[in-house]
């Protein structure tokens, strides 16, 4: 079983072409729904009394929600952001932490023996605390963001030291080490403790650092881009979901996991919020994977 810990949010996303208000979002939502295409997935997080019943049902249909706390006294985490014309830059308009500000995470007894744990972008101290609740996972992967790097860098470093792998984007990696070279960043990530590091570069693909080697992978070519919000979390969910089905962790399985991460990220950006991810099936993923291999085979 895979357990995903992170935020479940109501997102307001503004692009030059469309605005969607208070739609289902959050790091754990995207990551868990993406991962559920590969492995039985459970989710740990908190929502407020204003969380729509329809979103609760949507999550319930895709993942195990016994680890989801519903507060009767507070509101759901709300994130309001705007994208630039080319959708490459996002500006935060408003962040309302609400119920997550004082959230003390717990997990159901059934989750304790989870073999796979994904710590989605969240407060690094909360991530480390929830990690203590699991018995002995086979694989732990984490994510982070610029906010935590700028304000809690030491805790981010400690968190990275406790996991098997880390996924973050190019700007975050450069910020973490105050280093302009992405390859140097990847090597430095590996030196902290994890067995592998993945740096996502958006439309320029991804870079894997494993066993002292670099493995770059181009992005899946996508012409329809509506909302990039959940791309990274969808990548992470698919990445660990795919690895959970493999017999061993090696360069081959990691490279294939990166392909599946890019594929699920490419699906996520084709519609607003979570809409695309909940409307694809195994055949859609398989067809895109085969096309991906065909494009990049010489």
Question: Which residues does each predicted region cover?
Answer:
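Conserved N-terminal subdomain of the carbohydrate kinase-like
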Residues: 10-22, 37-119, 132-137, 286-298
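Short beta-strand scaffold segments in enzyme catalytic cores
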Residues: 33, 78-82, 205-209
């Amino acid at each position: 079983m895979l357990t995903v810990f992170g935020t479940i949010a109501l997102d307001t996303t503004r692009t030059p072409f469309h605005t969607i208000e208070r739609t289902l979002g959050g790091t754990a939502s995207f990551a868990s729904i993406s991962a559920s295409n590969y492995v039985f997935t459970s989710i740990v997080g908190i929502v407020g009394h204003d969380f729509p019943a329809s979103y609760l049902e949507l999550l319930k249909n895709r993942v195990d929600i016994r680890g989801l706390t519903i507060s009767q006294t507070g509101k759901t985490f709300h994130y309001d952001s705007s994208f630039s014309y080319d959708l490459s830059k996002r500006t935060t308009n408003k962040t309302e932490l609400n119920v997550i500000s004082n959230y003390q995470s717990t997990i159901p007894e059934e989750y304790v023996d989870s073999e796979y744990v994904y710590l989605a972008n969240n407060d690094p101290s909360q991530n480390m605390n929830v990690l203590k609740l699991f018995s002995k996972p086979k694989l732990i992967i984490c994510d982070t963001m610029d906010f935590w790097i700028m304000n809690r860098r030491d805790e981010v470093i400690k968190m990275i030291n406790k996991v098997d792998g880390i996924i973050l984007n190019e700007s975050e990696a450069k910020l973490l080490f105050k280093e302009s070279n992405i390859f140097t960043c990847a090597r430095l990530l590996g030196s902290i403790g994890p067995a592998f590091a993945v740096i996502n570069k958006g439309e320029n693909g991804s870079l894997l650092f494993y066993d002292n080697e670099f493995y770059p992978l181009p992005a899946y070519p996508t012409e329809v881009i509506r909302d990039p919000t959940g791309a990274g979390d969808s990548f992470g969910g698919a990445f660990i979901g795919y690895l959970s089905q493999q017999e061993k962790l090696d360069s081959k399985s990691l490279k294939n996991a990166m392909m599946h991460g890019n594929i699920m990220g490419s699906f996520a950006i084709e519609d607003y919020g979570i809409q695309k991810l909940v409307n694809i099936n195994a055949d859609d993923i398989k067809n895109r994977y085969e096309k991906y291999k065909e494009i990049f085979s010489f």
